[in-house]
Amino acid sequence: MDRWPDNRAWLLLLPALCLLALVGGLPLLAVVNYGLHDIFTLDQVHWVGLQWCEDILHSDRFWASLGRSLLFSALALGVQIPLGILTAKLLLSLRRRAVWGLVLCALPLVVPWNMIPMLWLGMIQPQTGLFGFVGAWGYDYKFNPAHTWIVILLVDTWHWLGLVAILAYAGLASVPQAYRQAAAIDGASAWAVFRHIELPRITGALAIVLLLRCVDSLMIYTEAFTINAGGPNDATRFLTLELGEEIKGFSYGQAAARASLYFLIVLTIVWAFVIATRREEPTA
């Protein structure tokens, strides 16, 4: 006779779920409500329904900024995931000394977000910067869109590469050494060991990294705004910058509608990721 599953453990999560609903659910409902109104002041609020969402969805600027955000996210993942795995492999070869490498990887994660772009802008200043010599090579992040993208991608990679490396290292360190030794006896190459032994056993950690970095890269704001304020010629004008400008312009109704659409985009990506992950899980 089958026994009913014991779900009493969910009671332990109840306080955290209530707190999450309070600090996350209520503000989200407030934003959705604001997005359905035209707000001038606290006393002048008019119902507009889905008008703001329709205007945004019919705007060419919205789709252009969405395309730039998705492109940046794809580039960030394409650069940071392989580099993070490579860094983790290097740390794994250091054995006990890997702890110092992990500390170095974690340092950028504790630097305040608003200080990171300022730090890098200072290093590429032609007169006093550590890498100021790149200006002599024709590098101009202020007026060249490709150069601006390179700076933003470099800054974001420096900031978050440590997270990818640490999680990938945790996955690689959990692989039994006996598997690698058996592969070495069989004459397997380093790539074969990684492809058939290590990679299948770190897919869980990589899935978490992929999801976190995908969502984080879509939220990029500080780097793009500080480095070139969305320029040149709106080349780095991401969704977050559009939202920030509407908030600064006191267009709270439009900003709330844009934030709601932004939330739906991220939620769709997370949902698609969860569905894809479940399909890859072996069935019992």
Segments from the language model and where they lie:
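A structural signal for multi-pass alpha-helical bundles of membrane permease subunits
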Residues: 5-284
